[in-house]
């Protein structure tokens, strides 16, 4: 008999958890003696945070990881968002860096670049008319939905043949450099990825706040701060919103 949809869902969660388990002996990032969020001053972690997965510092005051299925889903969401945040942070900084070094490709500020599609000439990807010349925001939106939907569907379904057992770390053709061949090295890379991903998500949040408050990109804000650190810093900008000022 064929399994029901709920059974398939439970099986998929269990499979992901099993496939994502890390075998790492003596690592400071895994197991009961792993590094905790407050170091030696950390309290006893919840019983369900055993140090089995990368990035587990024993901190979950809201109990978000208490349910195994919710924990598995949240872990997947965190890793995927971390990867997009790392790409996004690089995409926010790199155009500004190029522009500051004399490369001309249109608007360098990440939050202003997209608005060029509403201009009369439209938007040239990388400032090059021979690449993609976009003139319709609806067409771009539809294309993004189709492309991203196809990629996510491919990942979640396990590839065309369903041979990928772990959508978070698929391996195979997704690992052309064979970085996952050594289990110990792979376990450490998972920790590095999630740590840098969390920093990238905070960075993206900071970029959004900077854009709203200063109307400038991250490198321009950094240059302003280095030039006048007393007048250009988070505290100085925050006090501008104090009532009566």
From Swiss-Prot:
InterPro entries: Chloro_AB-bd_pln, Chloroa_b-bind. GO terms for molecular function: chlorophyll binding; metal ion binding. Chlorophyll b 5 binds at residues 144, 241. Chlorophyll b 3 binds at residues 136, 152. Chlorophyll a 3 binds at residues 116, 126, 193. Residues 1-28 are annotated as: Disordered. It comes from the Eukaryota. Gene3D superfamilies: Chlorophyll a/b binding protein domain. Chlorophyll b 2 binds at residues 83, 132, 161. Chlorophyll a 5 binds at residues 192, 210. GO terms for biological process: photosynthesis, light harvesting in photosystem I; response to light stimulus. The N-terminus of the protein extends into the stroma where it is involved with adhesion of granal membranes and post-translational modifications; both are believed to mediate the distribution of excitation energy between photosystems I and II. The LHC complex consists of chlorophyll a-b binding proteins. Belongs to the light-harvesting chlorophyll a/b-binding (LHC) protein family. This is Chlorophyll a-b binding protein, chloroplastic. It comes from Glycine max (Soybean).
């Amino acid at each position: 008999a064929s399994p029901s949809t709920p059974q398939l869902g439970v099986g998929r969660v269990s499979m992901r958890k099993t496939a994502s388990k890390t075998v790492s002996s003596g690592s400071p990032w895994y197991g009961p003696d792993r590094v905790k969020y407050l170091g030696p001053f950390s309290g006893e972690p919840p019983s369900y945070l055993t140090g089995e997965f990368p990035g587990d510092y024993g901190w979950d005051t809201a109990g978000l990881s208490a349910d195994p299925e919710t924990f598995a889903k949240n872990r997947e969401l965190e890793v995927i968002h971390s990867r997009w945040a790392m790409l996004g942070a690089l995409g926010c900084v790199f155009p500004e860096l190029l522009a500051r070094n004399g490369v001309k490709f249109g608007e360098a500020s990440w939050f202003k670049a997209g608005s060029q599609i509403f201009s009369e000439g439209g938007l040239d990807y990388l400032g090059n008319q021979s690449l993609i010349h976009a003139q319709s925001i609806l067409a771009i939106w539809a294309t993004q939905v189709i492309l991203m939907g196809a990629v996510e569907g491919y990942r979640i379904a396990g590839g065309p043949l369903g041979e990928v057992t772990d959508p978070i770390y698929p391996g195979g053709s997704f690992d052309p450099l064979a970085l996952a061949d050594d289990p110990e090295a792979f376990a450490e890379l998972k920790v590095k990825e999630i740590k840098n991903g969390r920093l990238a998500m905070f960075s993206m949040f900071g970029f959004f706040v900077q854009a709203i408050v200063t109307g400038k990109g991250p490198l321009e804000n950094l240059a302003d701060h280095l030039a006048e650190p007393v007048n250009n810093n988070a505290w100085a900008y925050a006090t501008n919103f104090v009532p009566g000022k």
